[in-house]
Amino acid sequence: MKCPFCGHADDRVLDTRVQKDGSIRRRRECLECKARFSTVETIMLAFPFIIKKDGRREPFSKEKILKGLQASCQKRPVSLAQIDAVVEKISAWVINRGESEISSRLIGKKVMAELKQLDDVAYIRFASVYRTFKDVQEFVETLEDAELLDFVDASNPQLSLTAMTFVESEKSTNHETDSKTPSPRTRPPGPLSN
């Protein structure tokens, strides 16, 4: 190991410890300048390339997944440790597949599956960006589809479609009535604010 202080190539190991994450920490001393420094040894993993929707290929990035999860879980009761655990689980899944290339669509589905177990609202947020809906109508239809709603517990839902249903019924009422006659606005059921 090259000394970071003088550049000399010879050193001796004073102490070796295995860390909780499986890496090895070594305390070293340069034989030339007697400076001490620490090194950490970890296994180098070869991540596959990601094939994007437009056909581009880019290296797998844990940071990108972390950033997407943090945005989806913003202001939700999800800890950073939980998010990190999901990132590590997805990374391990990607490596264990043993492929040199993997589609971004497949990774997106895996992220959605993990978020589905973690937090309902974060799952909906991620799905709304990942699925790239062309308009609100398509988003509402997808929400009504079992694919996105099968996770909502009927006894204690975190997400209510009442307001979305109300908006859709109001749109259809406006199309049926004369455009000169304004339709009366009503509120969806729920708590009133003063």
Swiss-Prot record:
<keyword id="KW-0547">Nucleotide-binding</keyword>
<keyword id="KW-0863">Zinc-finger</keyword>
<keyword id="KW-0238">DNA-binding</keyword>
<keyword id="KW-0804">Transcription</keyword>
<dbReference type="InterPro" id="IPR055173">
    <property type="entry name" value="NrdR-like_N"/>
</dbReference>
<feature type="region of interest" description="Disordered">
    <location>
        <begin position="168"/>
        <end position="194"/>
    </location>
</feature>
<feature type="compositionally biased region" description="Pro residues">
    <location>
        <begin position="185"/>
        <end position="194"/>
    </location>
</feature>
<dbReference type="InterPro" id="IPR005144">
    <property type="entry name" value="ATP-cone_dom"/>
</dbReference>
<dbReference type="Pfam" id="PF22811">
    <property type="entry name" value="Zn_ribbon_NrdR"/>
</dbReference>
<feature type="domain" description="ATP-cone">
    <location>
        <begin position="48"/>
        <end position="138"/>
    </location>
</feature>
<keyword id="KW-0862">Zinc</keyword>
<dbReference type="Pfam" id="PF03477">
    <property type="entry name" value="ATP-cone"/>
</dbReference>
<dbReference type="GO" id="GO:0005524">
    <property type="term" value="F:ATP binding"/>
</dbReference>
<dbReference type="InterPro" id="IPR003796">
    <property type="entry name" value="RNR_NrdR-like"/>
</dbReference>
<dbReference type="GO" id="GO:0008270">
    <property type="term" value="F:zinc ion binding"/>
</dbReference>
<dbReference type="GO" id="GO:0003677">
    <property type="term" value="F:DNA binding"/>
</dbReference>
<keyword id="KW-0678">Repressor</keyword>
<keyword id="KW-0479">Metal-binding</keyword>
<feature type="compositionally biased region" description="Basic and acidic residues">
    <location>
        <begin position="168"/>
        <end position="179"/>
    </location>
</feature>
<feature type="zinc finger region">
    <location>
        <begin position="3"/>
        <end position="33"/>
    </location>
</feature>
<keyword id="KW-0805">Transcription regulation</keyword>
<protein>
    <recommendedName>
        <fullName>Transcriptional repressor NrdR</fullName>
    </recommendedName>
</protein>
<keyword id="KW-0067">ATP-binding</keyword>
<dbReference type="GO" id="GO:0045892">
    <property type="term" value="P:negative regulation of DNA-templated transcription"/>
</dbReference>
<comment type="similarity">
    <text>Belongs to the NrdR family.</text>
</comment>
<comment type="function">
    <text>Negatively regulates transcription of bacterial ribonucleotide reductase nrd genes and operons by binding to NrdR-boxes.</text>
</comment>
